[in-house]
A protein has these predicted regions:
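Helical hydrophobic small-molecule/effector-binding pocket
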Residues: 82-108, 113-114, 188
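N-terminal intrinsically disordered/low-complexity leader segments
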Residues: 1-8, 191-199
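Solvent-exposed, amphipathic alpha-helical segments
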Residues: 12, 16-23, 70, 74, ...
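Short, basic, alpha-helical segments at the C-terminal edge of helix-turn-helix-like DNA-binding modules
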Residues: 61-67
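Hydrophobic alpha-helical connector segments
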Residues: 58, 71-96, 142-152, 192-194
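Helix-turn-helix
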Residues: 12, 16, 20-54, 58
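Hydrophobic alpha-helical segments that form the core
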Residues: 142-165, 171-182
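Amphipathic alpha-helical packing segments from all-alpha helical-bundle domains
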Residues: 68, 72-73, 95-98, 112-142, ...
Length: 199
């Protein structure tokens, strides 16, 4: 098998293994389960990975990508309709909750916790990029929108972990209120009107 095909197949296997971990749980999933899910002979997964640890960490990174792409994909598609955007984020959080719980199980694991931290740090470093991009869309400063981005991320994370709307709704409603204010201010600016003296 060529290296390109091996790399492509490895990506496919990571996605399948992540689904398997999400379904069965981190500690209950065996290498045999992963091989079966990936349609490999027993032990065949080690042609693509050296150790189970490597598989787990690759799946954790894939989980981060799924959650990040799911959330920010909605934001940049729907930010012109903030009410709809927030509703869709809630639906996405429902869907991604099992994936987030797998990720949390990796993060709190004695075996993998320290080793997954670099992937989490890379994610955190991208928040400033998203903040600037959202600020540009809303025609405001990054400083104005940054607390709202972090509040929304916190709300989504809490909801995906605990599946409790009572934790999620107040935070999301607070973020939505301020985002709507910024969107309305942008609209007034574009119309040449600054009601109430706000700039």
């Amino acid at each position: 098998m060529s290296e390109d095909k091996k790399t492509e197949r490895r990506k496919e296997i990571i996605g399948v293994c992540l689904d398997c971990f999400v379904e069965k749980g981190l500690t209950a999933t065996t290498t045999k389960d992963l091989c079966a899910a990936a349609k490999l002979q027993n032990g065949g997964i080690y042609y693509y990975f050296f150790t189970k640890e490597e598989i787990v960490l690759a799946c954790a990174e894939d989980a981060i990508d799924r959650i990040e792409n799911g959330a920010f994909g909605i934001v940049f598609k729907d930010i012109s309709d903030i009410k709809s955007m927030m509703d869709r984020l809630g639906t996405m959080a429902d869907k991604m909750s099992p994936t987030m719980r797998f990720l949390v199980s990796v993060c709190v694991s004695k075996e993998y916790g320290e080793k997954v931290k670099p992937a989490l740090s890379r994610l955190a470093s991208r928040y400033s990029y998203y903040t600037k991009k959202i600020a540009a869309v809303l025609d405001c400063t990054p400083a104005e929108v940054e607390p709202l981005v972090h509040l929304s991320i916190l709300a989504l994370n809490n909801y995906m972990i605990f599946a409790e709307r009572a934790l999620f709704n107040p935070q999301i409603e607070a973020a939505k209120k301020e985002l709507l204010r910024l969107a309305e201010r942008k609209e007034r600016r574009s119309n040449g009107s600054f009601g109430g003296g706000e700039t």
